[in-house]
């Protein structure tokens, strides 16, 4: 669902760029990137980062969709390891780790084999938009950052309040820190 971004007031920031002023209606919506935003913050992200995220549904994004791995047949290997038997049907699901699995059974098998607890974020392939997200930090570091709150989640699983704070941390990490996704971790 497209969000009408023209209804939000805008101003010019210290870098001379148009930015939206998001202060009023902060009701949560779930973006097509799987991240919870408000409608205004979603528009602000799209403007600032050149993305084209739209609204999936009202309310916060569900972290994971429940799945029942016990419904898949399993066997015990010669080494005594339990293995889930999956068919080859291509019915992709997106894991909470951002990886697309061929089907729900394959995701269950991955968790059993690797000892992980990856959940199902949604049916269908993971959206490429999220993986291609990046932030231009070439103008950083800066000595001071504004207090505007537009959270970004770093690859260190830490939430940064805005692009400036994130980019300063990227510079400090010598480029090892990358953007995981927009929004809180």
UniProtKB/Swiss-Prot annotation:
Q: Which residues are glycosylated?
A: 174
Q: Where is this site: Reactive bond 2 for trypsin?
A: 88-89
Annotated site location: Reactive bond 3 for chymotrypsin, elastase, proteases A and B, and subtilisin: 147-148
Which locations, inside or outside the cell, does it occupy? Secreted
Q: Chief subcellular site?
A: secreted
Question: What SMART domains has UniProt attached to this entry?
Answer: KAZAL (SM00280)
| Statement: the UniProt record of this protein carries the keyword Secreted | yes
Question: What CDD domains does the database record attribute to this sequence?
Answer: KAZAL_FS, KAZAL_PSTI
What domain notes does the record hold? Avian ovomucoid consists of three homologous, tandem Kazal family inhibitory domains.
> What's the protein name?
Ovomucoid
């Amino acid at each position: 669902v497209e969000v009408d971004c023209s209804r939000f007031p805008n101003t010019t920031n210290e870098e001379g760029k148009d930015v939206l002023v998001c202060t009023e209606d902060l009701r949560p919506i779930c973006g097509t990137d799987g991240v919870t935003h408000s409608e205004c913050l979603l528009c602000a992200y799209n403007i600032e980062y050149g993305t084209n995220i739209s609204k999936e549904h009202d309310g916060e994004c569900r972290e994971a969709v429940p799945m029942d791995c016990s419904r898949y047949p399993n066997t015990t290997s010669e080494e005594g390891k339990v293995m889930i038997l999956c068919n080859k049907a291509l019915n992709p699901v997106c894991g909470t780790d951002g990886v697309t699995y061929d089907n729900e059974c394959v995701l269950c098998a991955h968790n059993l084999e690797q000892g992980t607890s990856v959940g199902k974020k949604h049916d269908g392939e993971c959206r490429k938009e999220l993986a291609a997200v990046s932030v231009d930090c070439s103008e950083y570091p800066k000595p001071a950052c504004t207090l505007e709150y537009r959270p970004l989640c770093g690859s260190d699983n830490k939430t940064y309040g805005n692009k400036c704070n994130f980019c300063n941390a990227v510079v400090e990490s010598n480029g090892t820190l990358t953007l995981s996704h927009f929004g809180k971790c």
